[in-house]
């Protein structure tokens, strides 16, 4: 059999790449040495720190004179580019004397650290030196020589073997000079300070301007608010005034549409009542009375003011018997008053009565009855008993005068006055400003007279168709116009208050009078209008007869004619168709009145 033999195996001893990497990973990094360099001022200098092998995650640091150079403290002309894997460089641009010194490079990794140093000398070309061949290096000054540099400069000593050592100063950025004695940034800061001051002043000015504008706007706003409030108040007042004026105009328009408004309109009927204003309140039970109306024509009306007014009814009876004439004049005064002064102090006035030719109301008795209950307010009335008795005293001319026939030959049976001789005299009544208008007047007749009127009416019906009286009738007497007379009153019986105003307006009203006789008129004060008698008893009639003796004694026949005359007057007014009657009717009426009338009557 054939056998083979193989020689021994041989292994290569050369290390592989993996072995190298593994060995690098276990050995700490090592740097190459740097060379010292010397350059002139203003030249560029580059220092390079390199490792002998390539290590991952290496960190390089540069130090100058034992201090690490960082971005904060490095000079402007010194720059450190980005590190590479195996080396790091330091570039010095435009080198200065301050750049001279000892630079060191340090590398570190996880396995260990390593460092290397190099000296840099910066030479000044202007300085003369007698140095010969040799080298010089820069070292820090000793402690005693550090005072050579001022303002924080660093002192270095250049050692040159053939020459004596010299000192160099490395100055901060704001200083310069051989010993750092010159302050470079002084002018810069000065200029910057001026700018700062100007900027501050400008800022203050701006702040003041803005503040002033804000204050002005605030003041204007306050003024606007005040003005608005004032105008609002004024506008409200104007609206109130306009509203009031519109309301008044609306009321005026409504009043005009409703007709003219008169506070005291003239009455259509002049109501002649015996009115007495009492201080006490008259109960409504006494006020309910009948009212009958008759109309009388008045000559004219003077005013609408509620002053006193006097109406005098003067029926005159004239008759003639051949060559003799007799006159029977009867005055019956009806007093009408509506006093404003008394109405201020009293309660509602008394009832008002109306009268026609047949009957009359009973208001007079209620007034007289109420007048007796209030003697204080009636005591000073011009219609009181004392005043009437003084007015009718025979010593003075009496306003109510009765005359007997002038001829005694005329018997009472022949005294039948014709209808044409019966007239009424009514002076001016203060009622209305309209003139020459006719208004119905109202007379108040006591209840006793109404009873006698009824009796007289029965007798009048019996004598109406009697032919025996036709031959004895009297012809009408001639008429003539005369003026009324005014009667005087004594000064002592005038009221103490304001004197009454005459209502005739100083005019004398002319009336038609039969046979030339004059009618009488009585003016009475307007403050109160009531009569003194308060009841219908005989004692009151007798007392009135004692106070006025001449009324009951002078001519009883004339007083008995008063009811008949009043009745005839009312009948003629209410029934114009019977205004003209035969003399027989008048004589029958007269005789019946004489037979039935009491001798005492007022």
Swiss-Prot record:
GO term, biological process aspect, one: ventricular trabecula myocardium morphogenesis
Glycosylation sites (chain numbering): 21, 113, 126
- Ig-like C2-type domain residues are 29-123
Q: Which residues lie on this side of the membrane: Cytoplasmic?
A: 230-602
- Basic residues bias locations: 504-514
Q: What is known of its domains?
A: The cytoplasmic domain may be involved in the regulation of trafficking and proteolytic processing. Regulation of the proteolytic processing involves initial intracellular domain dimerization. ERBB receptor binding is elicited entirely by the EGF-like domain.
According to its UniProt entry, the function of this protein is described as: Direct ligand for the ERBB tyrosine kinase receptors. The multiple isoforms perform diverse functions: cysteine-rich domain containing isoforms (isoform 2-isoform 4) probably regulate the expression of nicotinic acetylcholine receptors at developing interneuronal synapses. Isoform Ig-NRG is required for the initial induction and/or maintenance of the mature levels of acetylcholine receptors at neuromuscular synapses. Binds to ERBB3 and integrins to form a complex which is essential for NRG1-ERBB signaling.
Its name, as the record gives it, is Pro-neuregulin-1, membrane-bound isoform
Species in which this protein is naturally found: Gallus gallus
């Amino acid at each position: 059999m054939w056998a083979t033999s193989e020689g021994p195996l041989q292994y290569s001893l050369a290390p592989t790449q993996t072995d190298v990497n593994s060995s690098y990973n276990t050995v700490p990094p090592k740097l190459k040495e740097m060379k010292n360099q010397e350059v002139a001022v203003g030249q560029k200098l580059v220092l390079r720190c390199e490792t002998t092998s390539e290590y991952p995650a290496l960190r390089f640091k540069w130090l100058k004179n034992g201090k690490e150079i960082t971005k904060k403290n490095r000079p402007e002309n010194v720059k450190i580019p980005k590190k590479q894997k195996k080396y790091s460089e330091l570039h010095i641009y435009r080198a200065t004397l301050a750049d001279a010194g000892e630079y060191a490079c340090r590398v570190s990794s996880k396995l260990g650290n390593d460092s290397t140093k190099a000296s840099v000398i910066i030479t000044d070309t202007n300085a003369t030196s007698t140095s010969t061949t040799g080298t010089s290096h820069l070292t820090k000054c000793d402690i005693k020589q550090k005072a050579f540099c001022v303002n924080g400069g660093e002192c270095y000593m250049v050692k040159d073997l053939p020459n004596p050592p010299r000192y160099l100063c490395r100055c901060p950025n704001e200083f310069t000079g051989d010993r750092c004695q010159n302050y470079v940034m002084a002018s810069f800061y000065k200029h910057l300070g001026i700018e700062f001051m100007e900027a501050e002043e400008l800022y203050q000015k701006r702040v003041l301007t803005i503040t002033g504008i804000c204050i002005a706007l605030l003041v204007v706003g306050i003024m606007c608010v005040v003005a608005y409030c004032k105008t609002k108040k004024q506008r409200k007042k104007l609206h109130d005034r306009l509203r009031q004026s519109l309301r008044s105009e609306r009321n005026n328009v409504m009043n005009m549409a409703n007709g003219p408004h008169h506070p005291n309109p003239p009455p259509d009927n002049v109501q002649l009542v015996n009115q007495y204003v009492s201080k006490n309140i008259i109960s409504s039970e006494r006020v309910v009375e009948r009212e009958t109306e008759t109309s009388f024509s008045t000559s004219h009306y003077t005013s609408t003011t509620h002053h006193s007014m006097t109406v005098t009814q003067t029926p005159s009876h004239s008759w003639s018997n051949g060559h003799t004439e007799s006159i029977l004049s009867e005055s019956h005064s009806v007093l009408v008053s509506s006093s404003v002064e008394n109405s201020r102090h009293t309660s509602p006035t008394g009832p008002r009565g109306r009268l026609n030719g047949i009957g009359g109301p009973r208001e007079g008795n209620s007034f007289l009855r109420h007048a007796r209950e209030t003697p204080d307010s009636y005591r000073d009335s011009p219609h009181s008993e004392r005043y009437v008795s003084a007015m009718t005293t025979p010593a003075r001319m009496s306003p109510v005068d009765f005359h007997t026939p002038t001829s005694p030959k005329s018997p009472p049976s022949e005294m039948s006055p014709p209808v044409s001789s019966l007239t009424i005299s009514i002076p001016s009544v203060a009622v209305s400003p309209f003139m020459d208008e006719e208004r119905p007047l109202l007379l108040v007749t006591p209840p006793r007279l109404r009873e006698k009127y009824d009796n007289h009416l029965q007798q009048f019906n019996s004598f109406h168709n009697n032919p025996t009286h036709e031959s004895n009738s009297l012809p009408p007497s001639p008429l003539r116009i005369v003026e009324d007379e005014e009667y005087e009153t004594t000064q002592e019986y005038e009221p103490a208050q304001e004197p009454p105003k005459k209502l005739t307006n100083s005019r004398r009203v002319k009336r038609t009078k039969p046979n030339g006789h004059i009618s009488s008129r009585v003016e009475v004060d307007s403050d109160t209008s009531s009569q003194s008698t308060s009841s219908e008893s005989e004692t009151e009639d007798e007392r009135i007869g004692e106070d006025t003796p001449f009324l009951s004694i002078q001519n009883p026949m004339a007083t008995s004619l008063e009811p008949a005359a009043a009745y005839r007057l009312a009948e003629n007014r209410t029934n114009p168709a019977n205004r003209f009657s035969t003399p027989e009717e008048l004589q029958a009426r007269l005789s019946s009145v004489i037979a039935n009338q009491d001798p005492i009557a007022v």
